[in-house]
Amino acid sequence: MRVGSRKLRRDEKGFTGLEAAIVLIAFVVVAAVFSYVMLGAGFYTTQKSKKVVDTGVKQASSSLTLDGQYIYLNCTSAANGQTGSSGKVGQVYFYVTQTAGGSPVDLNMTSIAITTDTGFKQLFFNDSCTPGTDCPWWYDDTVGDGDNVVEPNEKYKITIDVNNTEWSGIGELNPNDVVTIEVRPPIGAPLTITKTLPPSFTNLTFV
């Protein structure tokens, strides 16, 4: 009876060691799975944070810049303008390019806002009107591939017919007026241009 008892105790010790090994392996597996899950969650959080930061930067910075430092005032009678110290602007035009590192800008989804001492008006691009006839503003690609998107190394001319009735809320642009023009893309900060107009206009005045 004692021999059998000792054998039973040896078997119990052996079983206990095997059980401990199984439990240890289980702990290792669980720890590995937990680490993998936490690592994956960390990568996801990092990617999500990067995406949020990138989106914030795009929304806070402008993708358009003025090409050169001037805007041009067409004060000819053909543009319904008038020259001299009591003149008025017929059309305003200027050139824009994409900023370094900026995102492409779809001009068909862009709006122009004008602020004067008289008032404020914002108008989106209208592709159903005829440039130079009944459009409040339009664009032409001077260096580009002919589409509606401003991309790297491209230059677009934006023309604003300030005498178009849709701009009636801003009044006339006369000598010595202060005018702010904003080009507002669908994403990102606007390109803001503020100018004080000269005391007298010629047929083509740049400021």
Swiss-Prot record:
<dbReference type="GO" id="GO:0097589">
    <property type="term" value="C:archaeal-type flagellum"/>
</dbReference>
<feature type="propeptide">
    <location>
        <begin position="1"/>
        <end position="14"/>
    </location>
</feature>
<comment type="similarity">
    <text>Belongs to the archaeal flagellin family.</text>
</comment>
<dbReference type="GO" id="GO:0005198">
    <property type="term" value="F:structural molecule activity"/>
</dbReference>
<dbReference type="GO" id="GO:0097588">
    <property type="term" value="P:archaeal or bacterial-type flagellum-dependent cell motility"/>
</dbReference>
<protein>
    <recommendedName>
        <fullName>Probable flagellin 2</fullName>
    </recommendedName>
</protein>
<keyword id="KW-0974">Archaeal flagellum</keyword>
<dbReference type="InterPro" id="IPR002774">
    <property type="entry name" value="Flagellin_arc"/>
</dbReference>
<comment type="function">
    <text>Flagellin is the subunit protein which polymerizes to form the filaments of archaeal flagella.</text>
</comment>
<dbReference type="InterPro" id="IPR013373">
    <property type="entry name" value="Flagellin/pilin_N_arc"/>
</dbReference>
<dbReference type="Pfam" id="PF01917">
    <property type="entry name" value="Arch_flagellin"/>
</dbReference>
